Amino acid sequence: MQSPHISVLLDEVLDAFHGLSGTFIDCTLGYGGHSGALLEQNKNLRLIACDKDDEAIEFSKKRLENFGDRVKIYKSDFSQLIKVLSTDELKNVRGILADIGVSSLQLDKNERGFSINSDTLDMRMDRACEFSAADVINSYSQQNLAEIFSKYGELSNAKALAAKIVSARNLKKITSAKELASIIGTGRVNGRSVSPAILAFQAIRVEVNDELGELNRLLESIKSANLKECKVAIISFHSLEDRIVKNTFKSWAQSCICPPNAMRCKCGNDHAIGKILTKKAIVASQKEIAANPRSSSAKMRVFEIKGR
């Protein structure tokens, strides 16, 4: 079944989980590209997966139906999936993958409102939720807009952009992504490779879907699950996400948690739950980037949980 979305770092994901048996959790099922390839590669693997996009779930159910009872799919926020699994399900988990990105289909579909060319202003991953990008743009204070542009878009002119948006919406409600992009400006500035509109849209999307909160909650739920002999791979697409993953994995590998200025260890020096398998983030090859330019910002980090 042909997927409308190209899975990033697919070969690298297959390498990371080669020879895996037991249960595999795909926290971001999407259109089933990673999961389908892993099930095909690893014949003794069972899949538990989730997504919150109804369209993606329905597509993946059909795509993966030939794997029969090896597949179980939930509609859920990825941060909640591990919490709802039974003890029996968790004890056999040997791999976890989360691809923290927007699918190509979501970006390209006009009605989803993710693109700067969209006629809508939506950006919801889960369309059952009421809160959308239009609510952020038309109801947030100027200060709050500036804060999310600065924090999530890392825009140096966040205050100026927020002021432009508030001035525009005072004349009339902003209802489309195209309109918002024209207000912000789509030209590249200060030598940056992307326009302020792209970065601002990223910030709005992160806010609408609480993406960083979701990622933090997912990582905490993984640690709290007391897993053993389990590989965890996280694919992220911008520096804020990658920083969270990098720092979390570093903390998981830290045996001593005494203060840096402590003269001697008093914590027992046994707090590490595993080891980092990727000293540097894995990135897409030039061949993959040529075939799928959206993969250029993807970074994957892998951690092996040994348990304590």
UniProtKB/Swiss-Prot annotation:
Keyword terms of this UniProt record: Cytoplasm, Methyltransferase, rRNA processing, S-adenosyl-L-methionine, Transferase
Which SUPFAM superfamilies is this protein grouped with? Putative methyltransferase TM0872, insert domain, S-adenosyl-L-methionine-dependent methyltransferases
Function, as annotated:
Specifically methylates the N4 position of cytidine in position 1402 (C1402) of 16S rRNA.
Could you tell me the EC number(s) of this protein? 2.1.1.199
Annotated positions binding S-adenosyl-L-methionine: G32, G33, H34, D51, F78, D99, Q106
CDD domains, per this entry? AdoMet_MTases
The gene name reads rsmH
Q: Which GO terms describe its molecular function?
A: rRNA (cytosine-N4-)-methyltransferase activity
Q: Which GO terms describe its biological process?
A: rRNA base methylation
Q: Which residues form a coiled coil?
A: none
Q: Where does it primarily localize? A: cytoplasm
Question: Which compartment or compartments is the protein found in?
Answer: Cytoplasm
Kindly state one GO CC term assigned in the UniProt record.
Answer: cytoplasm
Provide the catalytic activity annotation.
Answer: cytidine(1402) in 16S rRNA + S-adenosyl-L-methionine = N(4)-methylcytidine(1402) in 16S rRNA + S-adenosyl-L-homocysteine + H(+)
Q: Which family does it belong to?
A: Belongs to the methyltransferase superfamily. RsmH family.
* Full protein name: Ribosomal RNA small subunit methyltransferase H
Q: State the organism named in the record.
A: Campylobacter curvus (strain 525.92)
HAMAP family reported for this sequence? 16SrRNA_methyltr_H (MF_01007)
